Structure formats: structure tokens, C-alpha cells
């Protein structure tokens, strides 16, 4: 039996680490010698748009909202959108998926397969033009999470909705088309390959050991402590063992929860605290970096997934994919997750 080690101390300049969920190998290339402080950006290059012409700052005259919150309370409206909104959900003007009454598949030349991209695309917009989520209060972040959950519960009832993706692109390098902070919700009629693989591996582990692999990892991380950057009663935020990028953070519930849409009020508050801590640390430690965060949760296709465990991934844009990453499909991180976590732990929430 292989000897277990509580601590991960790299002595060889590079190390391959296995992601237990995806079964992907990642490279921790510490031989490149980057210290945590090196990742901090001195000047952030962003496209500036004045609030006077920002479409989200002038939303009252443009969009038909699906959901409006004002200072923690859901509000109704008639005709005109009230000016005191703080978080709002609107349809995306440029959707990749469109609602349709039919879901059709076609085969071209007994070779290529197509289907119509049936679905819904929405934007979750916060009020302040210049405040990223890292600068919002815990209360304001909870309002965003309230919006995620409420829209999820509504969209999962729609026809041809089998998966709901919730994500946030912050900054130019992360693909944000508008500097005004906003998240996106997109529904799809199918389940992507990566999620199918995660579901398959999670189920196999559950069948073999009668335990959730995510719960097992959380227990190990709580004991080891070296990769933990924040912890409260309900949530754990870590730099994962097989980080796909420098300063990657995963936030997951300590309890076994397969379905994000079933999150309770208490859990939403705990998740808001974890998000605030993680995003604030990245903001301070990396100099307001561009980043993506996204939800991993069980599909809403009517099947049961008791072995899955929802979680959020935050990926700062600390490096770009080059030829090796694209060709070998293997990410390289130039800092140990343990050192990244140690650096972030020292920073305030």
C-alpha cells in the first residue's frame, strides 16, 4: 500500500497530480520559480465604459426583467422598472440558445450530427458599475445567490432544459464583454462531456466505497489544512490539490448536497461569506485579477444523482493556454496550491 502523507512538499522541480473527479493529470511546475507576489498585477488593462452609456446602468429603459431585487427583497413592478433595484435578471440580447417548441436532431451524410440549440440565456446584473463581486457586502452577494437559485428553480421546469450553467466572467481576460459586473445563466438540452465524466467517476467511487468522493476530499482537506483558505460552519474554500491554474479556488458545502437549487437560507448566507472571503483575497493578493467562476451541480433532467456534490470553481486568469496545454490537454500551474493557499490565508477577507 502506498504511504499516505499529510503534507505535500515538492522537492523535484515539477510534479504531476491527478484530479480525482475528472481523472485529468495537471502539472505543478514549481521549477519555474514564481513566488505568489509575482502573480499580482500592477496595472489592470480593461475597457472603460462610462456609466452614462453603459447598457446595464440604463437598464430601466431597455429591458423586460424576469426578476428584480432591491436591498434583499424581491419586488414587483408594473410597466416601468423601479429605480431602486440592486440586482436584476434580464434576457440576454445576444443569446447562444433560443427557446423553441421543438427539439430536432439531424444527421448529415451518415456522419455529422446537428441539433437546434434550444434553451434560455439570461443575465444577472448588480447595480454598481464599478464594484465587482469582491467589493460587494456579504448581504449583496447573497442577493446574487438568491437570484441564481430563483431563476434556476423556474428554468428547470421549462421544456428541453436538462442542464443549467451559471457563471461569471470578470475582466477582459476572462471574456467579459461588458465591464459592468454581471453573471450569466444558460440552459442546455444536453449534458456536456466534462460533466458526464465527473458524474461517471463520482458514481463509480460511490459504488465502490459507499462514500461521496467530494465529502472524502473535504474531510482530508479539513485535516491537512494546508490548502484551506477559508472555512465556516457550512462551507470550505480551498486551492485544490490538482489545481488547473495558479490560485484556483473551489468552494463546496461540507454537507453532502447534490443539487444547488435546494440550498437553504442558512446555506446561502454561508456560501456568500465564502465567496466574499475568496474573491476578496484574490482581489487583494492578485491585484484585482480577471477571473471566471462557475457552478458544478447535478443535471435537472429528471434523473437522480445522489453521488454528486455541487461546488463552485473560481479560476483567476494568471496565465494563458499555449501550445502544450491545447495539444496535450494538460494544464500547467507554476505555483504549488499549498503555497498559493498559504499566501491567500494571510490576507484579510
Regions found by a protein language model. Give the residues of each.
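HIT superfamily nucleotide-processing domains
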Residues: 1-349
Amino acid at each position: 500500500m502506498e504511504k499516505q502523507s499529510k503534507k505535500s512538499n515538492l522537492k523535484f522541480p515539477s510534479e504531476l497530480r491527478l484530479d480525482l473527479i475528472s481523472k485529468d493529470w495537471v502539472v505543478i511546475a514549481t521549477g519555474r520559480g514564481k513566488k505568489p507576489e509575482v502573480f499580482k498585477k500592477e496595472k489592470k488593462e480593461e475597457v472603460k465604459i462610462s456609466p452614462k452609456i453603459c447598457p446595464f446602468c440604463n437598464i430601466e429603459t431597455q429591458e423586460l426583467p424576469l426578476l428584480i431585487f432591491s436591498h434583499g427583497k424581491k419586488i414587483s413592478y408594473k410597466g416601468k422598472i423601479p429605480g431602486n433595484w440592486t440586482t436584476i435578471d434580464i434576457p440576454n440580447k445576444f443569446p447562444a440558445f433560443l427557446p423553441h417548441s421543438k427539439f430536432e436532431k439531424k444527421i448529415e451524410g451518415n456522419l455529422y450530427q446537428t441539433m437546434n440549440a434550444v434553451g434560455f440565456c439570461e443575465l444577472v446584473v448588480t447595480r454598481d458599475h464599478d464594484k465587482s463581486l469582491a467589493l460587494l457586502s456579504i448581504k449583496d452577494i447573497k442577493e446574487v445567490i438568491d437570484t441564481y437559485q430563483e431563476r434556476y428553480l423556474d428554468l428547470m421546469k421549462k421544456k428541453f432544459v436538462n442542464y443549467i450553467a451559471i457563471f461569471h466572467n470578470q475582466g477582459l481576460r476572462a471574456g467579459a464583454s461588458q465591464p459592468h459586473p454581471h453573471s450569466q445563466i444558460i440552459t442546455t438540452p444536453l449534458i456536456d462531456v466534462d460533466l458526464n465524466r465527473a458524474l461517471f467517476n463520482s458514481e463509480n467511487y460511490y459504488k465502490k466505497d459507499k462514500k461521496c468522493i467530494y465529502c472524502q476530499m473535504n474531510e482530508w482537506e479539513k485535516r491537512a489544512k494546508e490548502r484551506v483558505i477559508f472555512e465556516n460552519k457550512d462551507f470550505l474554500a480551498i486551492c485544490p490539490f490538482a489545481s488547473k491554474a495558479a490560485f484556483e479556488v473551489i468552494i463546496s458545502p461540507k454537507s453532502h448536497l447534490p443539487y444547488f437549487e435546494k440550498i437553504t437560507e442558512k446555506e446561502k448566507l454561508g456560501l456568500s461569506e465564502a465567496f466574499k472571503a475568496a474573491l476578496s483575497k484574490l482581489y487583494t493578493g492578485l491585484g484585482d485579477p480577471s477571473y471566471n467562476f462557475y457552478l458544478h451541480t447535478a443535471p435537472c433532467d429528471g434523473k437522480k444523482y445522489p453521488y454528486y456534490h455541487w461546488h463552485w470553481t473560481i479560476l483567476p486568469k494568471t496565465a494563458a493556454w499555449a501550445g502544450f496545454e491545447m495539444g496535450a490537454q494538460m494544464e500547467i500551474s507554476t505555483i504549488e496550491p499549498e503555497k498559493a493557499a498559504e499566501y491567500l490565508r494571510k490576507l484579510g477577507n
